[in-house]
Amino acid sequence: MKFYTSIPESLKPYYKAELNKYRTEYANGNLKSAWNHLERAHIIGQKYPYAHTFVHWKMLEFGIKIKNGKEIIGQIPRLIFGGVKSFVGKIPVGNPGGANVPPLKPFPIEKELQNIFEKAGIELI
């Protein structure tokens, strides 16, 4: 069994870029676009415990800020278990991380994100 710890340096710029885009879009009131960037950051970072947990924390904050009870409640178990599942390599690849989708269901990864993983030299699980 392979244990995952921190996000590789080759992938980190893409992860950080999505978080920065999230912050910018949120600050500009573009909530749908902001959420989309959180989902992309989740897909990029979900294999790595800290990155994965951090995105769920941001999703919880987002849910609180927009007063979405379903998102708030849905993020709590994801915060508790997401990082642990990442650590042992048991993640639903492509899952966008929001409470609007089943937490253990894998999803297809859009081509643009596949290209990011390829450029970074990261194999999808």
Model feature map: region roles:
Residues 1-35, 43-44, 66-125:
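N-terminal alpha-helical interaction modules that lie
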Residues 18, 37, 52, 56-59:
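TPR repeat positional signature
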Residues 38-45, 60-61:
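Conserved interaction-surface patches within small, structured recognition/assembly domains
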Residues 48-51, 86:
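Alpha-solenoid repeat scaffolds
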Residues 52, 59-66, 73:
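Internal catalytic or translocation cores that form aromatic/hydrophobic pockets or channels
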